[in-house]
A protein has these predicted regions:
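Short, basic phosphate-binding NTP loop
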Residues: 2-108
Length: 109
């Protein structure tokens, strides 16, 4: 299993990190989009949806021990470190591609 620190994730997602410098080297234990599943060491990805905007759950995940969040919005008073990105879904895709690179060399066209 690859170690993914907040610094790695910030780079992979092309985002901007906001938070204490010492937290950048902390390793993420899991990545979640469901705020109810966030816990100690989690990275919560806030996704704006048609009915519910995941950004409204950021205070909840911070109180549950989440290490950080990925947000499309600038947080005025962040309850925990966060990575600002242009598109949360693209950030998830970038993290997945980094974590589990796919090789298509075995396919014939």
């Amino acid at each position: 299993m690859k170690n993914m620190t907040l610094a790695h994730i910030t780079e992979v997602c092309g985002g901007t990190y906001f938070g204490p410098e010492e937290k950048k080297t902390a390793e993420v234990t899991d990545i979640v989009t469901d705020s109810r599943k966030a816990g100690e060491g989690s990275l919560f990805v806030a996704i704006p949806g048609e009915r519910v905007d995941g950004h409204k759950f950021i205070p909840n995940v911070a109180s549950q021990g989440a290490l950080a969040v990925i947000s499309e919005q600038t947080l005025e008073t962040p309850p925990c470190p966060y990575i600002l990105v242009k598109d949360s879904m693209e950030a998830i895709k970038a993290m997945a591609e980094y974590y589990m690179p796919v090789s298509y060399t075995h396919l014939r066209a």
